[in-house]
Swiss-Prot record:
Pathway: Cofactor biosynthesis; tetrahydrofolate biosynthesis; 4-aminobenzoate from chorismate: step 1/2. This is Aminodeoxychorismate synthase component 1. The lineage of its organism: Bacteria, Bacillati, Bacillota, Bacilli, Lactobacillales. The keyword DNA damage does not apply. It comes from Lactococcus lactis subsp. lactis. Part of a heterodimeric complex that catalyzes the two-step biosynthesis of 4-amino-4-deoxychorismate (ADC), a precursor of p-aminobenzoate (PABA) and tetrahydrofolate. In the first step, a glutamine amidotransferase (PabA) generates ammonia as a substrate that, along with chorismate, is used in the second step, catalyzed by aminodeoxychorismate synthase (PabB) to produce ADC.
Length: 470
């Protein structure tokens, strides 16, 4: 154990992939976990506990607090986030992963406040537009070196704070506990409701085709919502989702009652290198590996999916261009197929170098919400989504991630995501519609994207009694 620039560090070997579960131990409150489980995953999984500042926003006002005092209120949700992270210290330690900052989520509906279009959707869930915290204790699991680094911020001159921080870290740095106990079979059933965009009765699909035919937009992503009852603790649900639908961007966000297994990063900034990996174009996976390979080749050549994907690549390239240095934005990988638990997607990678005139909030503003969850052109697609989808999207289609004190950011699109509210879970899935889309095919795509999450509701869950399963 040692201190550098007011930071207490403890390293431990990674005993297993669940070592970050300390965030939900009895001593930790309002924990958050951003975990990389499999696939094209980043180097670090990160978590936080013991929040020292919070950010919350509703449809009108954003409030940032620090040490329990309200420090800032504003109509702009990004300004509140800026205030929440400015109290932290930039430790400037290389190769240490996440060293403190703000972790949380921006709901899709923050986009309405940023763009100023009409509010038409029904607000049927009491979910904040924004919820996050800045953390006193952080953890980074380094997948490259197979170690966990636990971090607490403390004044190098303040012995009392140093001792307290050291004790806190030592307490959570012990051997990993694992879930155990009897198995209970949970037989929840999801049901669809409010599927107006794909309903013949409302002709929502036909209205959308009219918009596409008239040139209002070239593509729009419409979604279906699914609802089921909560029959387990949220962290039990996270552990089960982690087993059944592992992905590169897993999230457990206790404060906002969110669990996620997203495959898509909307934007990241590491040392002024911008990176985004848009996903658009979907095909169901088959059981045989050889058939997967054939389908992957077909997916990349399918004219509808390829056109859908290229529109989104162009859109996110323009988004990065708003904050990138002139001439630095490039498409590094294009139209590659990636396999996930039940589907394969077309994925590309767009990169750029940050224009140093901009900082984290401007990067988020430039790319929010993600193009693959909205459409092209983005603002017009968002207006049409507001008209055709009956309820607000709330968290679905927003972003979950972190803004580090040192300025690095990493945000994932909130798809393959479950939200808990009022004793229920809800999840949504969408499909990108273009001029030659067929209604049945697009509806089936939204249904198949939910396959892993539907299985989640009917799975066997370990009802353990370990501290983090409270």
């Amino acid at each position: 154990m040692f201190t550098i620039s007011g930071v207490v560090l403890i390293t431990r070997p990674v005993y297993d992939e669940g070592s970050l579960n300390y965030c939900q131990s009895g001593a930790m409150n309002n924990g958050i976990l951003l975990e990389s489980v499999e696939g094209n995953k980043p180097r670090y999984s990160i978590g936080g506990a013991e929040p020292i500042g919070t950010i919350n926003a509703n449809a009108v006002l954003t409030a940032a607090t620090y040490a329990e005092d309200v420090k800032f209120t504003d109509a702009d949700p990004l300004n509140g986030t800026r205030v929440a992270i400015c109290n932290g210290e930039d430790t400037q330690q290389e190769e240490m992963g996440f060293q403190g900052g703000a972790l949380g989520y921006f709901a899709y509906d923050v986009g309405r406040r940023l763009e100023g279009y009409n509010d038409l959707g029904i607000e049927d869930w009491a979910i904040p537009d924004l919820a996050g915290s800045s953390y006193e204790i952080g953890v980074s699991a380094d997948h490259q070196n197979d170690v966990i680094v636990l971090i607490a911020h403390a004044s190098a001159d303040g012995n009392d704070v140093f001792i307290t921080s050291s004790r806190q870290l030592s307490m959570v740095a012990g051997p990993t506990c694992c879930a155990s106990g009897d198995v209970e079979i949970l037989r929840n059933k999801l049901h669809y409701y409010g599927v107006i965009p794909f309903s013949q009765d409302d002709c929502g699909f036909n209205r959308l085709k009219d918009y596409l035919g008239s040139g209002d937009m070239y593509q729009v992503n419409l979604g279906n919502r699914n609802v089921g009852a909560i029959v387990m603790t949220l962290f039990q649900g996270y552990n089960q989702l982690r087993l059944m639908n592992p992905g590169p961007y897993m999230v457990f966000l206790d404060e906002a009652n969110i669990i996620m297994a997203s495959p898509e990063i909307v934007l990241a900034d590491e040392a002024n290198d911008l990176n985004t990996r848009p996903i658009a174009g979907t095909l169901m996976r088959l059981n045989e590996q050889d058939e997967d390979g054939v389908n992957a080749a077909c997916l990349g050549q399918h004219h509808k999916d390829r056109a859908e994907h290229m529109m989104i690549v162009d859109l996110v390239r323009n988004d990065l261009g708003r904050v990138g240095r002139f001439g630095s934005v490039n498409v590094q990988e294009i139209v590659g197929a990636e396999n996930y638990s039940v589907v394969m997607h077309i994925v590309s990678r767009v990169t750029g170098s940050l224009n140093e005139a901009f900082e984290a909030m401007e990067i988020i503003r430039a790319g929010f919400p993600g193009g693959s969850i909205t459409g092209a052109p983005k603002v017009r697609a968002m207006e049409i989504i507001e008209e055709l989808e009956p309820q607000r999207r709330d968290g679905w289609g927003g972003s979950i991630g972190y803004i580090a004190y040192r300025g690095n950011i990493g945000y994932r699109i909130a798809i393959r995501t479950l939200f808990a509210c009022n004793g229920q879970l809800f999840a949504s899935s969408g499909a990108g519609l273009v001029g030659d889309s067929m209604e049945d095919g697009e509806y089936n795509e939204t249904f198949e994207k939910m396959r892993a999450l539907r299985s989640f509701f009917c799975a066997a869950v370990h009802m353990g009694k370990t501290p983090y399963l409270s």
